[in-house]
Amino acid sequence: MDRLTIRGDRFIDSAGRQVLLRGVNLGGDCKVPYPDGGTNHPSDFADHRDVSFIGRPFPLAEADEHFGRLKSWGMNCLRLLTTWEAVEHAGPGKYDTAYLDYFAEVARKAGDYG
């Protein structure tokens, strides 16, 4: 998608056409670890510092399928959700850099689809 500008109350593309944003929230399940949420198994529930959110909203191997489908439905806007627990679940100042790398790759792939 081209860079948009604002004219009055409208989004305008580089050709001067009005653009209607059609989009979705992606990642409604982002608040729980992957794959099973880590809260529905008694053995996992207490170990909140040793979880992974890599795979939320979906595994990278499935990204093309999901983004292609959204584009085919006419979506041109995406709100990619995450939660702070995914970034700092191990404790204050302990960032999950593997998750941040995963999330950056999901965002990059989304950009490939406009």
Segments predicted by a language model, with ranges:
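Aromatic-lined substrate-binding rim segments of carbohydrate-active enzymes
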Residues: 47-114
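Hydrophobic faces of well-ordered beta-strands that scaffold small-molecule active sites
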Residues: 20-24, 78-80
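N-terminal module-boundary/linker segments of secreted carbohydrate-active enzymes
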Residues: 1-21
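Active-site-proximal flexible loops/turns
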Residues: 20, 30, 88
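Acidic/histidine-rich helix-loop elements
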Residues: 25-62
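Short amphipathic alpha-helical segments, especially helix-boundary/capping motifs
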Residues: 4, 40-44, 80
